[in-house]
């Protein structure tokens, strides 16, 4: 609350019109907002304490940009009458929730129940996935890992699972090679999906690097799409079409369709227009089963499966799907479901199929083991603790650099906040992070790149805002543009240097920090794994050692750092 509108640009001349409300914060006490760009919000006038969403006109939208003094909001519905948002009024912004995901999951369950028996049996592990063994000689002669993976994906007749640990190139190389392999068949139709829009941007980046160029259409919104790929958005691709027949032909003739799972789920008519030979789904371990069922069980106008086979790419040792229920609430106790590997509703389809495949030593899965991101010393803990030492450095220049003059891994102890202070902020860590950021900037002044050099991870939005405030006080403009965010937002990205602020002030917070799973008796902290594997060259950690040492994995990490 406490935002005053200073400019209304609310046009009503069509869907493409700007629908942005700009506002500036009043000069009140310092606040730490827990909003970020792209968040779904509701906006309403709030000039009295009694004003709220139940007695004021509510507008829905998304945050287009957010600065220290200004918020830009893109309204979902164009307003033709500017007087509904008077410039002299005060406004409140609250987080909004979307029921689209829940609706699509219910629809997905219905589509599954009405799917062909053969597809239902496959997804319920009532029949094993089939594999074309005629390609075995080519697979055995593969010149590199990515060619082998692509050929195995081609040979799989039902599904193929690819485990891609951090830095192994599962999107930039493996997915790209699969697309090239499938696209070589002149008639092949390919559907490419991921969970987040940022990951879809990465898929588009991989597609754009293919030579000769491939034609693709992206399903999604402009706000959620990187500017470089907005020309491929379906609304732009179809803007020149004047007749439905032209729309039909454009979609039919484009052999690659790209989008998030949510975007494609919201366009079921796509499967009545096109039949896909393969669907390749990245970030599959972050997607719950009901979110995928509607797509994998879709049927075309002829009643046949709209998708012949699918490839799931992910890493069950990195972050899973985000759900509100705890493990006990989502546990499965039905014997028939347990018999097919469905043990918990929080698990992804990828995890269940992977467990079933490994139990039968089946060939419909593979794992990438050569990583080109982290220096071996940076990767040491995660490689030993979570991957059994199987990750091998590719040997890129930054991976073979000497560590004689550079600190690869360091811990900076902080102190907890005083009782009565919010548990979700730590001023000493914010100052440590800002000081480290300034030193890193000085070390890289000539080649500092805010999108590549430095990133900062911390678990709470309040701590994010505090760190940004401390960094802004340094007066270094380039540092104001670096990414400071939660570990969930960092999955899939990398930086030369990562700073991780644990922000633990009380023992009970340790449970929130972890996301535990177990494989072959080994305890794996998926959040810690992601945080430690974002850095290419250096990893710096700050936290309260007395509290962190209460967690066995964190204690082992601190012990390893001491040995450097």
What is the predicted role of each segment?
Residues 171-185, 206-208, 298:
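Walker A/P-loop NTP-binding motif
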């Amino acid at each position: 609350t406490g935002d005053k509108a200073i400019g209304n640009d609310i046009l009503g001349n069509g869907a493409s019109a700007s629908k942005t409300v700009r506002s500036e914060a009043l000069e009140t006490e310092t606040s730490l907002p827990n909003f970020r760009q792209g968040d779904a919000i509701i906006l309403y006038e709030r000039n009295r304490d009694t004003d709220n969403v139940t007695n004021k006109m509510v507008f829905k939208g998304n945050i287009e940009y957010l600065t220290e003094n200004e918020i830009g909001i893109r309204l979902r519905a164009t307003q033709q009458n500017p007087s509904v948002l008077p410039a002299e009024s005060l406004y409140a912004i609250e987080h909004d929730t979307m029921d689209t995901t829940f609706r699509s999951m219910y629809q997905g369950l219905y589509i599954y129940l009405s799917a062909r028996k053969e597809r239902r049996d496959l997804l319920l592990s009532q029949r094993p996935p089939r594999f074309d063994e005629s390609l075995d000689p080519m697979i055995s002669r593969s010149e590199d890992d990515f060619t082998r993976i692509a050929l195995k994906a081609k040979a799989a007749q039902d599904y193929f699972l690819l485990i891609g640990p951090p830095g192994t190139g599962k999107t930039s190389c493996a997915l790209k090679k699969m697309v090239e392999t499938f696209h070589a068949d002149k008639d092949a139709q390919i559907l490419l999906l991921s969970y987040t829009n940022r990951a879809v941007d990465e898929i588009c980046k991989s597609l754009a690097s293919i030579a000769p160029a491939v034609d693709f259409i992206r399903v999604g919104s402009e706000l959620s799409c990187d500017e470089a790929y907005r020309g491929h958005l379906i609304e732009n691709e179809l803007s020149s079409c004047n007749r439905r027949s032209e729309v039909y032909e454009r979609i039919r003739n484009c052999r690659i369709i790209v989008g998030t799972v949510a975007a494609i789920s919201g366009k079921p008519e796509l499967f009545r227009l096109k039949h896909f030979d393969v669907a390749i789904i990245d970030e599959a371990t972050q997607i719950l089963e009901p979110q995928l069922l509607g797509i994998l069980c879709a049927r075309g106008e002829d009643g046949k499966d709209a998708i012949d086979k699918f490839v799931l790419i992910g890493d069950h040792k990195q972050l899973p799907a985000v759900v509100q229920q705890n493990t006990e609430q989502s546990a499965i106790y039905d014997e028939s479901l347990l018999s097919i590997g469905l043990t918990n509703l929080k698990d992804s389809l990828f995890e269940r199929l992977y467990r079933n495949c490994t139990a039968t030593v089946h060939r419909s899965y593979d794992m990438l083991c050569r990583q080109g991101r982290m220096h071996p010393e940076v990767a040491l803990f995660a490689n030993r603790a979570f991957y059994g030492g199987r990750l091998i450095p590719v040997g890129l220049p930054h991976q073979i650099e000497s560590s004689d003059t550079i600190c690869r891994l360091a811990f900076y102890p902080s102190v907890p906040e005083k009782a009565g202070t919010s548990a979700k902020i730590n001023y000493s860590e914010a100052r440590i992070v800002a000081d480290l950021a300034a030193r890193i900037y000085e070390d890289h002044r000539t080649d500092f790149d805010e999108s590549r050099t430095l990133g900062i991870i911390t678990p709470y939005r309040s701590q994010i805002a505090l760190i940004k405030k401390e960094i802004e006080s340094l007066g270094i403009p380039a540092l104001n543009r670096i990414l400071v965010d939660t570990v969930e937002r960092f999955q899939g990205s990398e930086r030369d240097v990562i700073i991780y602020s644990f922000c633990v002030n009380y023992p009970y917070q340790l449970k929130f920090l972890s996301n535990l799973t177990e494989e072959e008796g080994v305890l794996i902290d998926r959040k810690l794994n992601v945080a430690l594997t974002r850095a290419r060259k250096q990893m710096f950690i700050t936290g309260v050692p007395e509290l962190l040492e209460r967690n066995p994995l964190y204690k082992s990490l601190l012990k390893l750092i001491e040995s450097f």
